[in-house]
Amino acid sequence: MAIITMKSLLEAGVHFGHQVKRLDPRMKRFIFSERNEIHILDLQKTLQGIKDSYELVQRVIKDGKKVLFIGTKKQASEIIEQEARRSDMPYVNNRWLGGMLSNFNTIRKSVQKLKKLEKMEVDGTFDMISKKEISQLNREKLKLAKNLSGIKDMETLPGAVFIIDPKREQIAINEARKLKIPIISVVDTNCNPDVIDCPIPGNDDAIRSVALFTKIISDAILESDKEVGIQIIENLNEEDLMKEIEIKNDKSDSIEEGGNNL
């Protein structure tokens, strides 16, 4: 059973939003306070978002469908691939190609081309063609693999998508909404939560925060067949929470980790 504590969220810098001037007004309901011109997110609502997302993911997996992990920004890319691979799920971590969902059949043709080239490389076909042809085919393979390797085994549309940074992945969100595919996403204070089915209020820039959220989704997938849920431990009262926020109010840790949360 996954155990999530409010203190673990604080330690990952989950509560840090952007500068107050960058607030999307639709995020106001998720704001706890303001410190040094930085919005502080309400971790009670973050915990609820985690719980709702965990349960949705487990329902999707039990229905025999997959969750597509999406995160192409620098500080999310490696984490997205790592956690998607750990839970044997498809992922997009380099660039979202328009139509990956809405024009899925065409994208599948490109995936089949990639698989064919990979097969040619190992079945001896390359031994029977010229070096020039091999070079051309390798360039084509690398180009396809760069954007499609994470979805090679996604034979059908996913049952849900998990997204880091919905502002950056707006095209993916539009396609998922068009196809009525449930969207789970970490939403920072500059995001629009109203287009997300399961919004998780949180810092989508700091590496530790991104890693924590992505691991939680991966854990939900891996534990879906064990009939176990998630345990939320709210181990800080409001007074303690304010003290912790004051202690951790220096945003330098988040920035040093690859965040650009200002």
Swiss-Prot record:
Q: Which PROSITE patterns match?
A: RIBOSOMAL_S2_1, RIBOSOMAL_S2_2
GO molecular-function terms, A-Z: structural constituent of ribosome
Give the GO biological process terms: translation
Q: Which InterPro entries match?
A: Ribosomal_uS2, Ribosomal_uS2_bac/mit/plastid, Ribosomal_uS2_CS, Ribosomal_uS2_flav_dom_sf
Task: List the keywords (alphabetical).
Answer: Ribonucleoprotein, Ribosomal protein
- Domain of life, source organism: Bacteria
Return the GO cellular component terms, semicolon-separated: cytosolic small ribosomal subunit
Please report which protein family the annotation says this sequence is part of.
Belongs to the universal ribosomal protein uS2 family.
- Official protein name in the record: Small ribosomal subunit protein uS2
Q: What is the lineage of its organism?
A: Bacteria, Pseudomonadati, Spirochaetota, Spirochaetia, Spirochaetales
Q: Which gene encodes it?
A: rpsB
